[in-house]
């Protein structure tokens, strides 16, 4: 609807330029917002105040001329001037009802991408292999997954890329330890303890560390024995990751793995091409690119090191190789990097070097979707009581157990296997939603008690809200798609719910553009609250007439489908009863 209003305003502006009221060459960003007070309209624009000065008119006078120049629209019943010159637009409720009827008949609930479909690479999760995933991997994994789901739902071709850390010193360390301590495959599957023991040896013994580095050199040279061990470690580690992804209900598979090692053969070419472009400078034996835009506190340009003095390559080299693979081989239109906000400088430098070097042959928009930190109650990065790293699988297991106990207390008569299933859906959903509902760039404090609360903006509340809607149809023995009739909007609570339902597509496009799932979370929470008010004030099963009951059932059906689809786009399963 906002796009429709923007188009109407643009047509009015064009007319006023033709009439000589406005000067030529204006290209304002037309802002349309939801009106705060519904008695004064559904949407508001400040366009008259923005253009009053170039028009040489008072805002209210320009607003009057804009209203007169607005084309007629079946979607708008009237437009009024408010305050210093706001344009307030009132929706035509009949047109709104028709749009909702159409949405109910549409698999995508009326949601369409604002622009043309694109090919989008999502760089997400990216754990370092050789040890198990920890809580620090949660945000990249689930935020990336949610945005990928939304983009796919809107019609984009999404390529997920799990840029795992599958190369480097840690593998030499593990191979050296395995040479000293031959163990069985079963023992090796406990990778965390094996890694911890190897790291202890590496830190304590210089001889061991030297041997480990030597094995890395052999690995890089393609030594068959080292490659076989590396493959074994990698497969075990990826198997651990896959179990975590499945528990998280994240759409990542082995086929999505595109680790650091995938770019090994191109690293020397990256350095050679940078040199050919005249971008490389040798600094203390290292090969660097210096960009004037990025300076240290002393005002000196910061180096982007692509090759160390000993010939080794760095993260920047691998990321540059990945950029040109994604642009020139995958032909992506966008590449979204869901990586910690603290890596912002690194990616800004890499993107700029890639542009200057001509690595982005196919036009590709590169966006670092940085995120904040998940902290403990003390406001510091989340740790175990003894200060260690929390395994992600352990956190999720605890969430399942806590939710199971909570659900069992509320529903002691349910069979244990059903309680276990509900506990898993609620527990995993609670952890994910608590994260996704926060602004991507914000830090937040992890709190089991808050996230498992059945009140407030939480997964349990939304899951229960969905079961309420499903319960109405269960009583009737109908599905959401088995209600005839037409939607007719009469009561204020019906209109409020309808107006919010109509915004689903706009919300999804916002998430797709900015990579911000919290916007979808806020929308679903608001929608659940509006349905609750509608349900309490507009009887469905006890409606006054059959046509009124059908209309309200259709509103309820669209609410149920929107809640279910919205939660699915966040990566949350739903339940038919709790």
UniProtKB/Swiss-Prot annotation:
The cellular location(s) given in this protein's UniProt record come to: Cytoplasm
Q: Does the keyword Aminoacyl-tRNA synthetase apply?
A: yes
Matching Pfam families: Arg_tRNA_synt_N (PF03485), DALR_1 (PF05746), tRNA-synt_1d (PF00750)
Task: Please state the protein's primary subcellular location.
Answer: cytoplasm
A Gene Ontology CC term for this entry? cytoplasm
Q: In the record, what terms sit under GO molecular function?
A: arginine-tRNA ligase activity; ATP binding
Catalytic reaction annotation: tRNA(Arg) + L-arginine + ATP = L-arginyl-tRNA(Arg) + AMP + diphosphate
- Please provide the record's keywords in A-Z order: Aminoacyl-tRNA synthetase, ATP-binding, Cytoplasm, Ligase, Nucleotide-binding, Protein biosynthesis
Q: Does Ligase show up as a keyword for this record?
A: yes
Question: Which EC numbers does the record give?
Answer: 6.1.1.19
Q: Motif range for 'HIGH' region?
A: 127-137
**Coiled-coil region(s):** none
Per the UniProt entry, what are the Gene Ontology biological process annotations, in alphabetical order?
A: arginyl-tRNA aminoacylation
- Subunit details for this protein? Monomer.
NCBIfam families named in the record: argS
Q: Which family does it belong to?
A: Belongs to the class-I aminoacyl-tRNA synthetase family.
Q: What is this protein called?
A: Arginine--tRNA ligase
User: Which gene underlies this protein?
Assistant: argS
